[in-house]
């Protein structure tokens, strides 16, 4: 920007502040507006669709300017944050009445996508995470902080693949990275292409300074208790995230009182593509409808919904924790107490986020009202918890806590319907503070005084139309008509002239005005002081209240899962230490919810003889639905939910992989087939015998022979080397012969019936390969013109006749079943007879007994034989 010497004092102040926040939009408070100047104004006018104007000239040039009213700033901020922008809020902190020159201003808050705490800027059912990544050797430290709840976590990841998967699970709104271009280039593309990346000075990641920052914040001697004392990459990531959040919020973040270091392999792993394919909480079009989360989430509170989402996206492998959840759900169902719990949970507010704002001293009066109502519900919830018998309920009962004194204070402190903001006053109830009551009484008695004054003045002046009134601009006044203005007493001082009236003030009315206005100011100041005291009181119990909030959220999730277990006819699964998966009459909840027809349930069975299952059958027959429902049932079981099946027993599962569907990745310049092969390569490199693997139509993105060759080799790798639980759907019928090669492979198919040239999908999984693909019938259902279908039938008939003739010639058509199969791609072609004879002669040849001339003659003979055979 231009040299500040050329600018007015106010613009010099603006430019000095802006220099410290070059990457943020600067909201610069001027009276009742936030103003933006220069490039910020141009950018904001485009993003917010507000008017771009100019504020005179400074330095000889017009200054672009745009502004928004401060009272409606939150709506504009929400829009900017959704667009990935960061905003620095610069407030007036000086008193304009005593300022010489520009009023003193200061940036009090920087709003970034990952540091939101304001209720209007957050989504109720989604976490809003700030993340930081740091690399040490080949390992990555990843830390996340939910500023709005205080949850602080970190983990060490062994490679970039697991880093990518974990970032996809967490979906952070903002990621802090060292400002080293090489570091960013070495990150997975999935992270490089994410919005919200922040380049932060690399020196902030220095391990020793980060360690000290964390130790100082938590008030400990080391980081042993947090499980990361010997993890330098984790320490750097966690230290940076704390520094960044404190800087943006201009706060110490006292509500962040712990750091949890976790192992990524404690949870059932899903890569980014698997999460998308299975539509856990986001559908394939990016929406939230028709997902598993939308089906399962019946939570009463917002924090319960967020915890439900976390459980769904992070299914645990610890069977003890999961069985505790099963027991709690079963207990509440048996005692029929889910509706009582829901009724008791209804008044509970979003305590996690309210308490964070309490800690930051940004809580609004209605936050405190909801907190008070929530505390009043705790005795009822405590009684319900104690009626349950499962261990989990007893643990939650102890964690819940009761706060009778605090609840009573909050109940008596606030009016029944407080204003949105503390600045408006009128927050505290009558009787809470005697000094405030006295100041308010003075204002409340003003009406009686003014009526008495009006009556006295009418009598004194003889002006019967005289009125006493008040407005915010001119204060109290005595109003008479212009016709009567000549009759006013000498002590009447003109205050305002209107078209038909004159307004006056008297010494008595002025004295009263000063007293009332002073009382109003003092009352508002008293309320602000009382509010500050109330927040300080709440902060004394902050950690205990946060534990209470966590207990309420978990209670809500378990009650919700119990309710949905009844509503959706779910069954308690069994988690076994023995390998295998046995699901009886499993269902796909989302498809079932959307369908007007009864859902056809199916069994899934994996054991040592059924590790690889080749699935054939027509398109639209239900192969993908069957595969997805198997994975979704596994995820539900490992998150601690009952499952849609008559029964389900699941052995250990470490990962779920899906290779279902694909499209071009235009941003990275990758074709559909390249995307498919990249996903397949990831599976082949990382799958284990405990992995559940779904592979749909592998190889279809290239030529028939290339695709078949790849599909065959990949299926062989699954059966022979990986030996995971693999559902392998294909239209390559040749793969059904793998059952003859491997004793852990079986064929299954989705049945269909053809009737009068039409196909009826049975959606039933049956043993053995499909008899045909029904491709033409599906095409007809899709509306392909009849003329095209008729031509296709002729071509199909011709191709089948050619295949049958070739098989009869080669002697391979030993049965009617074999005659309709395609050729074995991997059969060795027959050699010409002359070559076979030559090879036999060469095998019998004793090279050591040949003279040089005989050897040369033999070489000529071999050469001629090969040439003749190839012609």
UniProtKB/Swiss-Prot annotation:
UniProt superkingdom: Bacteria
Pfam families according to UniProt: MutS_I, MutS_II, MutS_III, MutS_IV, MutS_V
GO annotation (BP), single: mismatch repair
Signal peptide: none
Keyword field contains Nucleotide-binding: yes
Residue positions binding ATP: 617-624
Keyword terms of this UniProt record: ATP-binding, DNA damage, DNA repair, DNA-binding, Nucleotide-binding
A molecular-function term among this protein's GO annotations: ATP binding
Gene3D superfamilies for this protein: 1.10.1420.10, 6.10.140.430, DNA repair protein MutS, domain I, MutS, connector domain, P-loop containing nucleotide triphosphate hydrolases
PROSITE patterns, sorted: DNA_MISMATCH_REPAIR_2
One GO cellular component term: cytosol
Keyword DNA damage appears in the UniProt entry: yes
HAMAP family the record matches: MutS (MF_00096)
Role, per record: This protein is involved in the repair of mismatches in DNA. It is possible that it carries out the mismatch recognition step. This protein has a weak ATPase activity.
Record family assignment: Belongs to the DNA mismatch repair MutS family.
The protein's name in its UniProt record: DNA mismatch repair protein MutS
Organism: Hydrogenovibrio crunogenus (strain DSM 25203 / XCL-2)
């Amino acid at each position: 920007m231009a040299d500040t010497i050329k600018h007015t004092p106010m613009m010099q102040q603006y430019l000095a502040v802006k220099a410290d926040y070059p990457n943020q939009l600067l909201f610069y408070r001027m009276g009742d507006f936030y103003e933006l100047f220069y490039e910020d104004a141009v950018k904001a006018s485009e993003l917010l669709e507000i008017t771009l104007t100019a504020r005179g000239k400074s330095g000889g040039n017009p200054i672009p300017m745009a502004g928004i009213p401060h009272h409606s700033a939150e709506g504009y901020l929400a829009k900017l944050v959704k667009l990935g922008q960061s905003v620095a809020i610069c407030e007036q902190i000086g008193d304009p009445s005593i300022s010489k020159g520009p009023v003193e201003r200061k940036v009090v808050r920087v709003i970034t996508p990952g540091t939101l705490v304001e209720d209007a800027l957050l989504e109720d059912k989604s976490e809003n995470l700030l993340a930081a990544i740091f690399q040490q050797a080949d390992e990555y430290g990843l830390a996340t902080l939910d500023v709005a709840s205080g949850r602080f976590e970190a983990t060490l990841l062994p490679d970039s693949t697991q880093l990518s998967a974990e970032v996809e699970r967490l979906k952070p709104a903002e990621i802090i990275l060292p400002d080293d271009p090489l570091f960013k280039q070495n990150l997975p593309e999935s992270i490089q292409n994410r919005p919200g990346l922040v380049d932060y000075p690399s020196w902030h990641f220095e391990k020793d300074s980060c360690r000290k920052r964390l130790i100082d914040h938590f008030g400990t001697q080391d980081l042993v208790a947090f499980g990361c004392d010997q993890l330098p990459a984790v320490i750097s990531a966690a230290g940076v995230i704390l520094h960044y959040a404190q800087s943006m919020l201009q706060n110490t973040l006292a509500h962040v009182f712990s750091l949890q270091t976790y192992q990524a392999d404690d949870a059932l792993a899903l890569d980014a593509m698997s999460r998308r394919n299975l539509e856990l909480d986001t559908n394939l079009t990016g929406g939230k409808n028709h997902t598993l989360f939308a089906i399962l989430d019946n939570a009463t509170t917002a924090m319960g919904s967020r915890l439900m989402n976390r459980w769904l996206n992070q299914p645990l492998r610890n069977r003890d924790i999961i069985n505790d959840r099963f027991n709690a759900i079963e207990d509440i169902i048996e005692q029929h107490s889910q509706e009582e719990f829901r009724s008791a949970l209804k008044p509970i507010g979003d305590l996690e986020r309210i308490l964070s704002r309490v800690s930051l001293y940004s809580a609004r009066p209605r936050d405190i009202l909801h907190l008070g109502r929530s505390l009043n519900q705790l005795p009822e919830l405590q009684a319900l918890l104690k009626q349950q018998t499962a261990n989990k309920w007893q643990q939650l009962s102890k964690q819940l806590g009761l706060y009778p004194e605090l609840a009573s204070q909050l109940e008596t402190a606030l009016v029944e319907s407080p204003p949105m903001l503390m600045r408006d006053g009128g927050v505290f109830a009558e009787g809470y503070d005697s000094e405030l009551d006295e100041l308010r009484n003075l204002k409340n008695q003003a009406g009686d005084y003014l009526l008495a004054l009006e009556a006295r003045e009418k009598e004194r002046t003889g002006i019967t139309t005289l009125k006493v009134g008040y407005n915010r601009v001119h204060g109290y006044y005595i109003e008479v008509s212009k016709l009567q203005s000549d009759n006013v007493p000498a002590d009447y001082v003109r205050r305002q002239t209107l078209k038909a009236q004159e307004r006056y003030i008297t010494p008595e009315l002025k004295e009263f005005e000063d007293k009332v206005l002073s009382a109003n100011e003092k009352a508002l100041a008293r309320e602000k002081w009382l509010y500050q005291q109330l927040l300080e009181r709440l902060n004394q119990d902050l950690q205990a209240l946060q534990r209470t909030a966590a207990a309420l959220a978990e209670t809500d999730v378990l009650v919700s899962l119990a309710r949905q277990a009844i509503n959706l006819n779910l069954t308690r699964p069994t988690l076994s230490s023995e390998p295998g998966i046995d699901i009886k009459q499993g269902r796909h909840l989302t498809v079932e919810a959307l369908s007007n027809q009864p859902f056809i349930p199916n069994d899934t069975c994996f054991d040592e003889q059924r590790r690889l299952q080749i699935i054939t059958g027509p398109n639209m027959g239900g192969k993908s639905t069957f595969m997805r429902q198997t994975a979704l049932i596994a995820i539900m079981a490992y998150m601690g939910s009952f499952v849609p099946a008559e029964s389900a027993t699941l052995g250990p599962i470490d990962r779920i992989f899906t290779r279902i569907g694909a499209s071009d990745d235009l941003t990275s310049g990758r074709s559909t087939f390249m995307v498919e092969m990249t996903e397949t390569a990831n599976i082949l490199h990382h799958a284990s015998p405990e992995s559940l693997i779904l592979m749909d139509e592998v190889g279809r993105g290239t030529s028939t022979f290339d695709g078949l060759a790849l599909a065959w080799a990949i299926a062989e790798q699954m059966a022979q080397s990986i030996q995971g639980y693999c559902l392998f759907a294909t239209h390559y019928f040749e793969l059904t012969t793998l059952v003859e090669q491997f004793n852990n492979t079986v064929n299954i198919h989705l049945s269909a019936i053809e009737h009068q040239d039409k196909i009826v999908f049975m959606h039933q999984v049956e043993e053995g390969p499909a008899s045909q693909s029904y491709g033409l019938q599906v095409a007809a259902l899709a509306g392909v013109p009849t003329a095209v279908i008729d031509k296709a039938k002729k071509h199909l008939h011709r191709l089948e006749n050619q295949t049958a003739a070739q098989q009869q010639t080669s002697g391979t058509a030993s049965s009617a079943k074999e005659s309709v199969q395609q050729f074995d791609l991997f059969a060795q072609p027959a050699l010409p007879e002359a070559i076979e004879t030559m090879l036999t002669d060469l095998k019998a040849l004793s090279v050591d007994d040949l003279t040089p001339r005989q050897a040369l003659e033999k070489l000529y003979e071999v050469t001629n034989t090969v040439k003749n055979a190839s012609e």
